[in-house]
């Protein structure tokens, strides 16, 4: 017999069932939401190269093409592919680190390549230690470091790129130490390749700071590549003889530079001319390279006790004719790389600064200083000995300090492990610690950027909590790749905003208490302190966008609305006023992503559309009254009419500044004139006004996107130049006569009063501000011509 439940019991039991279901469902979700780093088997500190290598290994193992009998293969591969797509992208990685997968709702991915792609096309040079795969954020710093770079721009799907790969690897091994060999994957870094003018693959370019890039056009053999590279290597080999020997040696020794000399005699082997040239390039600025023909310089060779062919390194101050009692290094190898490594290993270490003189030395010069504890770990990398030479022209001295000799000094600088830092000539007050790669080109780029920027390392003693001047503080962790990528941009921004804002960085792995005090929950978190006001930066990691953010703080482009001001400014707006309003909530991630784009859009619409935002967390009742049901809700309030209160809601997929701007401008009344063949002839070709014309076709997508921009241009030049539009679908003959071959085409028709006729110029940009600037420049030229003609009369 069944048991009847009363209504209250039924509702109570139903709630329990639903609660149990939700608990089980959430447990399943948590169980399946695997950490992206764990999926790929990498740490949170993994570099882009390590992430690519880990993904490739898994892709070859788990790809559905290799597991046709596994029904879960597709789903399993999608998970690791998703993890890779997110972690390889700097912006997505930052979102994931900060918000988890919820922060990636607008970036769902879901596509992957065939197994053959991952086996043969993916990460072509990731396993080659002599070849450095460069990414956009590090490219400029690398090629401007002062070293010579030869870079291969390739595409994974390009057959010629794969044909070149074995030769490029052999070439890289051949010239290792002579110059840097790089590679750029244009499939991953399309923007970088476009910026560098790369439009075919493979494209090979030589880069050196201070000179224009040089493209290689020869055949792709190793010998031809070596020959081309050697043309750009700075190498001078001196033939030594009785007439120049003493002066050459003494001059070099006085400058602290030694000599590598190969003596060529009848017996034994001396270095070939090609090997000597390569060594000269590899040791440029560190050691002079020379050779001596003992057949013609017999007495000189005998005085040096040289009786057979040999090669020797003479350090500064060596006694040349007494090889038993000094540090002359005789070399048995004939291989350039082996000789290079042995010579550079024997070069003296950097100057060791003492605790007593440290403050004074740092106060009078700019220094790159290595901190070590007892043994100098940097001596294991002989390449770093090039730093002194490569930083000489930047007036940066290079030294080291042993923290075990004065622990208090390092503790006060918050140096607790081997590190390097730049000191900017003001003692220990102004310095910046390096958090990048411990390799030559990265250290060079850091040193040059840091001494010329205004970023300082912060600690409790100099944290600007109550400073009267505004500060931008970057809270970061050294293990976080997006944090490291942001640091060079902060240095650039500090130069752009010098005198307006101070810049500092705070390492949250060292100063955990300070970071907790300011509730720092993700890295990097960038905050502007302006006395009692604190503003968190949410934009992209670029100097330009940081500059925009600061400018917006000083001169806000978006009106922060309250229910009262919304009623006064928006609801009761003047007849000819229009508004765009963002209804948002601070906890909403898409709202946070939108905010910098919203501000950027507002700056471009100044004087045309009023832009505001209202916090629906603070004014929840008001937003409910306005029927705001989701965040962010973007509304356009058109000019007031006799109609009831109305607005347009934005339903577009893209919430970037450009898309929102185009959408808003589309509601404004047309200012330009629609022209027919008759009016085009009468007003433009036979009239006496300047005209800018948009030739378009209604079916053309780019034309539709450009239409609001052209209306913005029409408003900007109103009163100076008239703006018109010609429909080339309706009036094909008119457009044909005007020489129109693509849509949209913009032409400027300017009336020359002196000649009483029209001239025309095609404009090759679709940016309203740029077009307006070009037109203003042309009008100024016409005015100056008119003045000169009057003066001549």
Swiss-Prot record:
Effect of residue 161 to A: Abolishes disulfide reductase activity
EC number(s) on file: 1.8.4.-
UniProt comment concerning the protein's domains: The thioredoxin-like regions Trxb 1 and 2 lack a redox-active CXXC motif. Thioredoxin domains 3 and 4 are the primary reductase domains.
Disulfide bonds: 158-161, 480-483, 588-591, 700-703
The keyword Oxidoreductase is annotated on this UniProt entry: yes
Induction data: By endoplasmic reticulum stress.
UniProt-recorded name of the protein: DnaJ homolog subfamily C member 10
Region (Trxb 1): 235-350
Record-linked InterPro entries: DnaJ_domain, ER_disulfide_reductase, ERdj5, ERdj5_TRX_C, ERdj5_TRX_N, J_dom_sf, Thioredoxin-like_sf, Thioredoxin_CS
Gene3D superfamilies: DnaJ domain, Glutaredoxin
PANTHER family: DNAJ HOMOLOG SUBFAMILY C MEMBER 10
Residues carrying covalently attached carbohydrate according to the record: 530
Signal sequence interval, chain numbering: 1-32
Enzyme type, top EC level: oxidoreductase
Subunit relationships: Interacts with EDEM1. Interacts with HSPA5 (via its J domain).
Domain J: 35-100
Protein's cellular compartments: Endoplasmic reticulum lumen
Motif (Prevents secretion from ER) on chain: 790-793
Key words, A-Z: Disulfide bond, Endoplasmic reticulum, Glycoprotein, Oxidoreductase, Redox-active center, Repeat, Signal
GO cellular component, one term: membrane
Region named Trxb 2: 348-463
Keyword Glycosyltransferase listed: no
Main localization of the protein described in the UniProt heading: endoplasmic reticulum
């Amino acid at each position: 017999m069944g048991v009847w439940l009363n209504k209250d019991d039924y509702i109570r039991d139903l709630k329990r069932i639903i609660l149990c279901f939700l608990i089980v469902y959430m447990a399943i979700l948590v169980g399946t939401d695997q950490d992206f780093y764990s999926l790929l088997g990498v740490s949170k500190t993994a570099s882009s190269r390590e992430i690519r290598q880990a993904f490739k290994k898994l892709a070859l193992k788990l790809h559905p093409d290799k597991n046709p009998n596994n029904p879960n293969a597709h789903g399993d591969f999608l998970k690791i592919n998703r993890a890779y797509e997110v972690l390889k992208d700097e912006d997505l990685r930052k979102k994931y680190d900060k918000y988890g997968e919820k922060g990636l709702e607008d970036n769902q991915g879901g596509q992957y390549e065939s197994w053959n792609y991952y086996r043969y096309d993916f990460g072509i040079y990731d396993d080659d230690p002599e070849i450095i795969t460069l990414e956009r954020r590090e490219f400029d710093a690398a090629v401007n470091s002062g070293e010579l770079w030869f870079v291969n721009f390739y595409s994974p799907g390009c057959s010629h790129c794969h044909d070149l790969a074995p030769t490029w690897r052999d070439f890289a091994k051949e010239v290792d130490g002579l110059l840097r060999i790089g590679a750029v994957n244009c499939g991953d870094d399309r923007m970088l390749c476009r910026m560098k003018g790369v439009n075919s693959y493979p494209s090979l370019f030589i880069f050196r700071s201070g000179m224009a890039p040089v493209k290689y056009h020869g055949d792709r053999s190793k010998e031809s590549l070596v020959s081309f590279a050697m043309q750009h290597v700075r190498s001078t080999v001196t033939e030594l003889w009785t007439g120049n020997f003493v002066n050459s040696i003494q001059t070099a020794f006085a400058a602290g530079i030694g000599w590598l000399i190969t003596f060529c005699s009848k017996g034994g082997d001396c270095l070939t001319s090609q090997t000597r040239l390569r060594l000269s390039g590899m040791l440029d600025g560190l050691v002079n390279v020379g050779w001596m023909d003992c057949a013609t310089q017999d007495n000189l060779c005998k005085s040096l006790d040289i009786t057979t062919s040999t090669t020797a390194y003479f350090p500064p101050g060596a006694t040349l004719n007494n090889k038993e009692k000094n540090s002359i290094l005789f070399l048995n190898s004939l291989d350039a790389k082996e000789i290079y490594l042995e010579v550079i290993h024997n070069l003296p270490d950097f100057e060791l600064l003492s605790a007593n003189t440290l403050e004074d030395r740092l106060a009078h010069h700019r220094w790159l200083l290595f901190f070590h504890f007892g043994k100098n770990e940097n001596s294991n990398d002989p390449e770093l000995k090039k730093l002194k030479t490569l930083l000489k022209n930047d007036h940066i001295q290079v030294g080291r300090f042993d923290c075990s000799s004065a622990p208090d000094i390092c503790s006060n600088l918050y140096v607790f492990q081997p590190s390097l830092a730049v000191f900017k000539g003001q003692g220990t007050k102004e310095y910046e610690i390096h958090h990048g790669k411990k390799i030559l080109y990265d250290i060079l780029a850091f040193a040059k950027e840091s001494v010329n920027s205004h970023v300082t390392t912060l600690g409790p003693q100099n944290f600007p909590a109550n400073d009267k001047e505004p500060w931008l503080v970057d809270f970061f962790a050294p293990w976080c790749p997006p944090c490291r990528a942001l640091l060079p941009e902060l240095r650039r921004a500090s130069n752009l905003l010098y005198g307006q804002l101070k810049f500092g960085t705070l390492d949250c792995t060292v100063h955990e208490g300070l970071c907790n005090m300011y509730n720092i929950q993700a890295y990097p978190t960038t905050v502007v302190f302006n006395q009692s006001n604190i503003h968190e930066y949410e934009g992209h990691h670029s100097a330009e966008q940081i500059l925009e953010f600061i400018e917006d703080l000083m001169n806000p482009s978006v009106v922060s609305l309250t229910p009262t001001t919304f009623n006064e400014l928006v609801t009761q707006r003047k007849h000819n006023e229009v508004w765009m309003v963002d209804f948002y909530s601070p906890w909403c991630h898409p709202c946070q992503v939108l905010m910098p784009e919203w501000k950027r859009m507002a700056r471009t619409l100044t004087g045309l559309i009023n832009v505001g935002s209202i916090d629906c967390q603070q004014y929840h009742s008001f937003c409910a009254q306005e029927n705001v049901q989701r965040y962010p809700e973007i509304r356009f309030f058109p000019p007031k009419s006799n109609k009831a209160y109305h607005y347009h809601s934005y339903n577009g997929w893209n919430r970037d500044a450009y898309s929102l701007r185009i959408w808003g401008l589309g509601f404004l009344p047309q200012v330009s004139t629609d022209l027919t063949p008759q009016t085009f002839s009468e007003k433009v070709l036979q009239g006496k006004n300047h005209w800018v014309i948009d030739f378009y076709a209604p079916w053309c997508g780019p034309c539709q996107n450009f239409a609001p921009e052209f209306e913005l241009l029409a408003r900007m030049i109103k009163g100076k130049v008239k703006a018109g539009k010609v429909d080339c679908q309706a009036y094909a003959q008119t457009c044909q006569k005007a020489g129109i071959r693509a849509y949209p085409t913009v032409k400027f028709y300017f009336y020359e009063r002196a000649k009483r006729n029209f001239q025309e110029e095609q404009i090759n940009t679709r940016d309203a501000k740029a077009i307006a600037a070009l037109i203003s420049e042309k009008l100024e030229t016409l005015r100056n011509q008119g003045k000169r003609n009057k003066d001549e009369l």
